[in-house]
């Protein structure tokens, strides 16, 4: 009698059998089974276990792991799953890996470190675990094959430069709890077509979406008070812009070169309006009452008219290269006419030639040489 291990084909328990017999009765479930089948089942299962152990050992050799942090990946596989003991992907762990196409992160991974996947130009897909809490700065910058990203539900911020220059990124889905989108977060994502900024976002950093050339619509939520410098600059397809009542300031070049913008409605309560330089699609622009400062509108080559409230006393920028801008409604225009070159060179020059007041076009009193309309003294 030669006793060997087998697995009962009925209950799955491991039992010892006589390999010379044709049949055996399981001592656990009292069910008879064919001996050769039970022996083969045992061999197959343990062969598979051995193969998996071998694969894990081989796979593990590609990883450098310290205290649960995946410090470095040294392999060249196209698909990688994080080992079970990993709770953080360390800084630079996969940086500039050009063979990696797919990454699977298990539920214990809570943090992806800075620069972790930067320059992984072949990376097409990454599945984030639901419990992921943070993706640090520059983590996926330059992942030019990445097309779709779904941010997991517990993340509260998008760090600086996280997805910058992901030139083939088409869509990004944010969870509602996101409160901050960092500087340069999606800068240079020239194929990004759709974004829906969550209602709890209060900060959109500078250059956050600059160079997103296919982005057509943006709605800024109520909690955002400042649109930072160049946040949406060079979004050349942007044609629909919704600005909330919570906005107090539009920063320098915030919408620079958004050439598809035709109409922009600035809500009341905005104190400073800047950022529309090079918006060649604008024909008319109204600055709301209460605004105290406006900035640079130069290179708005098709702008024909602008309305500015009396609360604005001076302008810090200019309207150079606005050749069509002749219709200006502003009570303080007289003191600032030089900032409107087209207006100054045509309207003011013609008034001088006609002997009229350069400020309002009125006639002068004969003796005092003061304007009968605005009271300004003739100074030319």
Regions found by a protein language model. Name each.
Residues 91-93, 113-116, 136-139, 159-162, ...:
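Consensus positions within tandem repeat domains that build extended binding/scaffold surfaces
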Residues 57-66, 74-88, 98-111, 121-134, ...:
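Structural signature of tandem-repeat unit edges
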Residues 8-11, 26-29, 357-360, 371-374:
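Short cysteine-rich clusters marking metal-coordination/redox-active sites
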Residues 5, 23, 354, 368:
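Residues immediately within or flanking Cys/His clusters that coordinate Zn2+
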Residues 22, 38-58, 341-347:
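Short, intrinsically disordered terminal segments enriched in charged and Pro/Gly residues
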Residues 16, 34, 363-366, 379:
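Short functional micro-motifs and their immediate structural scaffolds
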């Amino acid at each position: 009698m030669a006793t060997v291990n087998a697995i009962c084909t009925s209950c799955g328990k491991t039992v010892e059998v006589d390999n010379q017999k044709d049949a055996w009765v399981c001592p656990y479930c009292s069910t008879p089974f064919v001996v050769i089948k039970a022996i083969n089942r045992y061999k197959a299962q343990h062969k598979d276990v051995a193969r998996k152990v071998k694969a894990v050992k081989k796979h593990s050799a590609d990883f450098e792991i310290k205290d649960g942090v995946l410090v470095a990946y040294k392999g060249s596989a196209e698909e990688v799953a994080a080992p079970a003991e990993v709770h953080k992907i360390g800084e630079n762990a996969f940086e500039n890996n050009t063979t990696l196409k797919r990454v699977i992160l298990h539920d214990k991974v809570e943090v992806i470190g800075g620069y972790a996947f930067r320059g992984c130009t072949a990376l097409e897909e990454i599945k984030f675990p639901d419990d992921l809490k943070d993706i640090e700065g520059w983590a996926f910058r330059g992942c030019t094959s990445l097309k779709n990203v779904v941010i997991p539900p517990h993340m509260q911020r998008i760090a600086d430069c996280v997805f910058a220059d992901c030139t083939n990124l088409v869509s990004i889905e944010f969870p509602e709890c996101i409160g901050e989108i960092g500087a340069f977060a999606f800068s240079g994502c020239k194929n990004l077509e759709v974004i829906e900024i969550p209602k709890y976002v209060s900060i959109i950093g500078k250059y956050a979406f600059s160079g997103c050339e296919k982005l057509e619509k943006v709605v800024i939520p109520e909690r955002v008070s400042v649109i930072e410098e160049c946040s949406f600059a060079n979004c050349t397809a942007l044609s629909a812009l919704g600005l909330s009542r919570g906005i107090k300031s539009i920063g320098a070049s915030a919408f620079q070169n958004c050439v598809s913008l035709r109409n922009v409605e600035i809500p009341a309560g905005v104190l400073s309006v800047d950022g529309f330089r090079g918006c060649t699609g604008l024909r008319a622009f109204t600055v709301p009452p209460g605004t105290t400062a406006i900035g640079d509108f130069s290179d708005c080559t098709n702008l024909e008219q602008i309305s500015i409230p009396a609360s604005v006393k001076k302008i810090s920028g200019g309207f150079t290269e606005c050749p069509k801008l002749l219709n200006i409604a502003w009570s303080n225009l007289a003191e600032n006419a030089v900032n409107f070159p087209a207006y100054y060179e045509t309207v003011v020059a013609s008034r001088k030639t006609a002997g009229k007041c350069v400020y309002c076009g009125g006639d002068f009193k004969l003796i005092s040489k003061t304007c009968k309309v605005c009271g300004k003294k003739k100074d030319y």
